[in-house]
Amino acid sequence: MIVPDTEGLLIYSYGLMYGSYCMACQMLIPHFQCIPGIFPNFRISTELIKTMTDKLEQPNNNVPQQPWGPFPPAFGGRPSGEQTDGNPGEFDNDAAHQQTAPFMTHFFPRIGLQFPDFTEYQRFNGFQRNAFFPNPFGSQFTGQAFAQSFPLHNSMTTMDGFNLTHAPHPFSTNTNSTKPKDIENTVQSTIKHSSENIQDKPPVLSVEYPVKYDSELKFDANVDFTAVPKQESSDDSTLKNLKKSDQQLQQPQQFTFPPPLLAEKSFEQPRMREDVLPFHPQFYPAPLDMGTNFKQEMRTPPIDGHIDYRKFDASGKRMEFQPPGALHDCQVCLSTHANGLHFGARTCAACAAFFRRTISDDKRYVCKRNQRCNNASRDGTGYRKICRSCRMKRCLEIGMLPENVQHKRNRRDSGSPPRKTPFDTFFNGFYPSFQPSGSAAQPITVSSSESPRHTTN
C-alpha cells in the first residue's frame, strides 16, 4: 500500500524494509506490523532514500560535475583574453604561450605542472615557460636608474685570455723573431698599450709563465711555472723571464747515460747484460772512435732522454735486430709482446715453444741464405721472414739456455717406463754393509717386455 504525501514524498506500506531500516517506523529488525510514527519521521526516511539514490546514479549522470570523465586533463592554460599581461617575471599561464607536451598528458594526467619540460633556470624564475636568459645581474637592475652597462670579464673562449692581463699576447709564436731586442720592444709597446686601457678593465690575478718555443720545449722539461711576486712589477718579471729563457737556449743540452747494470725484476740480482755497451763518461771526455751511427746517436739526443743501447753490439756498430720496445717485445721475433722469461730470456710463447721443440727433439736446421736472415718478423701473409736456423741462432744469441729445457726421456708424461733401482743396492746409501737374507737371493731386474714386479730365479 503506497500513500502519496502532500509534499510529493512517498510513504511505503508497513513492513517494507530498505536495507536494515523500516520505511515507516525506522525499526532496525524485520517486523510484520509497524508502530505508527510521527510524520516528520517519514520525511527523514524519504530524504535518506533520495541521498542513497543520488550516490548510485552519480557515475551515470556526471555531466555538470566532471565533463572530462574519470581523469582530469592536463593544465593547458587559461583561454586567451581572460587575464591581462602582467609582470613577465610571474608565472605565465596564457594558453597562447604554452608549450605542448603530449606525452605528459598520458603519464601524469592529474598533474598540472609538467616537470620534465622545465629547465633549472626556469624553476628559479617562477616556472616561466618562455623564460629567456636576462641580464646576468637580475631583473632588479633593469630600471631607469640602471641604464648604464656594467663592464664584464672577457670571454674565456681560448687559453690566451685565461688568468692573464687583458691585453694582446706579448710573445709572438714566430720562431724567427727570437732576438732579445725585438722581444723587449714588443713587450714595452704591449705594456704601454695595456696601461692606456687599464681603467675599464677589472682587476685580475697576473701570472706570468716562462714562454718556451717549439725548439726549446723538446729538450727542456725541468722549468717550473713561476708566479709574479707582489712587490715586483709584471714588466720587470717579463724581461727577466725572457733573459732566462734566452740563456737556456744558449746552454748545451746535457743528458745522462743509464747504468750498465740492469735487473730484469726488483728481486733479481743485477747482472751484466751482454747486449748493453758499458760507457763511463768520466773516463772518456772525448767521444769514442766508434761507428758513425753511434756518433750520430750521441749528437742527436732522443726526445725521451735515453739511448737504446740494444741497437749496438760490442764493437759499436748498429745491430741488425732493432727491437721497437726495450723490455716489452719479444727479443727473438721482435713483433710479438713478450709474456715473460722463457729459458733465461724475455720472449713470447711462440718462440719459447720453438726453442723447446728444437732442443728436446734434437733438431738440426740449415739456412739457405748462408745465415743472412736478418728479419724475424712476419710478412703480410703471416709467414716469418727468417728461417728456422737463423731463428734458433737468434734464440741462443739473446741468452736462451738449452740446459733449461727438459728432455722427453725425463718428462713425467713420457711413454718410457721410469728407471728403477735394484733392490740389493737400494739401501747402500744408508746401510753400506746391508746384505739381503739368503745366499740364493738374486737382484731384481726389470725388462721392457715383463712386468716390473716379476722376479727371475
From Swiss-Prot:
Residues 327-407 bind DNA. SUPFAM superfamilies: Glucocorticoid receptor-like (DNA-binding domain). A zinc finger (NR C4-type) spans 330-351, 367-395. One of its GO terms (molecular function) is zinc ion binding. Belongs to the nuclear hormone receptor family. NR0 subfamily. It comes from the Eukaryota. Heterodimer with a partner that confers DNA binding capacity or a nuclear hormone receptor whose DNA binding it inhibits. InterPro entries: HNF4-like_DBD, NR5-like, Znf_hrmn_rcpt, Znf_NHR/GATA. Expressed predominantly in the AWA neurons. Disruption phenotype: Worms are defective in chemotaxis to the volatile odorants diacetyl and pyrazine and weakly defective in chemotaxis to 2,4,5-trimethylthiazole, but respond normally to the odorants benzaldehyde, butanone, and isoamyl alcohol. Induction: Down-regulated by the cyanotoxin microcystin-LR. It is found in: Nucleus; Cytoplasm, Perinuclear region. Changing residue 155 to P: In strain: CB4855. One of its GO terms (cellular component) is nucleus. This is Nuclear hormone receptor family member odr-7. The lineage of its organism: Eukaryota, Metazoa, Ecdysozoa, Nematoda, Chromadorea. Required for the function of one pair of chemosensory neurons called AWA neurons that are involved in chemotaxis to volatile odorants. Acts in a pathway that specifies olfactory neuronal fate. Regulates the transcription of olfactory signaling molecules such as odr-10 that specify AWA neuron identity and function. Represses the expression in AWA neurons of factors such as str-2 which specify AWC neuron identity. Residues 57-95, 230-252, 435-457 are annotated as: Disordered. One of its GO terms (biological process) is positive chemotaxis. Keywords: Chemotaxis, Cytoplasm, DNA-binding, Metal-binding, Nucleus, Olfaction, Receptor, Repressor, Sensory transduction, Transcription, Transcription regulation, Zinc, Zinc-finger.
